[in-house]
Amino acid sequence: VVVRLQNTIRDYAWGSPTALPELLGVEPDGKPQAEMWMGAHESAPSVLPNGDTLYDVVSDDPAAVLGEETAERFEGRFPFLAKLLAAGQPLSIQAHPSRDQAIDGYERDEAAGIPRDAADRNYKDAWPKPEILIALEPFDALVGFRPLDRTVALLDALAPAGFEALTNQLRDGKLREAFTDFMSTDRDTIRPLVGALGEAVAQYVGDAFELERETLAKLCADFPDDPGVLAALLLNRIRLERFDAVYLPAGNVHAYLRGLGFEVMANSDNVLRGGLTSKYVDVPELVSVVDFEPLTDPVLTAEADGVYETGCPYFAIRRVDLDGGERVVEGAGPRIVCCVAGTIDAGGKESVVTLSAGQSAFAAGPEGPCILRGSGAAFVVSAR
């Protein structure tokens, strides 16, 4: 059976007050609306038409809801979490752990007796959080380390006072040392460095680094004593166009800046932060999970059949574009369908749910193919 989901909107301070309401076709209430969660994460599970949460239904009978193979492979846990994400302000500089790192970190936090909902707890669960974000409008982000020669060229072009040692570190290939030094610097030392960077950015004339200049100017003004501003110097600054994507495996350092997107991740809430945030920051733990291999080309596009190929073992995602026709999406395992434009009918063996933009539906593991009809665009997320 395919059923409609009722989803929770998270009101994190960085959220846009207008982007999600506009997508949903409702009046904004003036408050930030950052993320709409679709899935069975215990923090904010979707609700089924009968009032049960998807988390409770999965917990009661994983094999019936997920299918026997998926239930066994993911230890009875719903494998993925989907979100609509609307960033009005920058999110934190962050990375996510691998499965082994998450298990180890979770066991350490449990042994230390840190409550699972404590602000200073790093590992909320024992699962990794690889994720993909697909832009629904132009979306700005910092993603992965820029190749070192490009970062040296950026620093040479800006020539901020006091950054000579950093530039030399990068020329010598010492990215880990440079990132760790930046993120570990106290705020009294950071403030004049951010000030010098802001002055250099204001005086920069040229178009080779226009996106970088725009972002650094805003970060220097908004976070004058935050080491995350300096870390931003080291990351790829990208702008995704509609339906472009970025895939973030374990260890990828990133920060979303602004825009509306559809996001899918493994079913985890493990985030290790290093800056650009008022939330808990743990630099040594962040550095311990970071992948310091530079990322040359972060942008991912869909294949001809609409599939975004990530290789992630926790989920698969396909975009379906319809112009009055029908598409049969084969597959097994639990699926979430989210309409992002127009009106889509999502059906299974016994039922059909009509979805408008921002609405979603769930099909259980044994349901069989999912049939989509209508005019618009939708994402179909399934277990890998």
Model-identified regions with their sequence ranges:
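Generic C-terminus detector
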Residues: Q89, A341-R384
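C-terminal, non-catalytic macromolecule-binding modules
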Residues: G259-V307
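Conserved short histidine dyad/triad with adjacent acidic residue
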Residues: P313-G331
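Active-site cores enriched in adjacent His and Asp/Glu residues with nearby glycine-rich loops
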Residues: D188-A232
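A short beta-strand-loop-beta hairpin characteristic of the jelly-roll/cupin
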Residues: S59-A71, D225-E241, V329-E330, I336-S356
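Transition-metal
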Residues: V1-V205, S278-T296, I317
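A short hydrophobic beta-strand segment most commonly corresponding to one strand
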Residues: L91, I132-A141, R258-S278, F315, ...
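Short acidic-glycine-tyrosine-enriched beta hairpin
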Residues: L235-Y247, N252-Y256, G348-E367
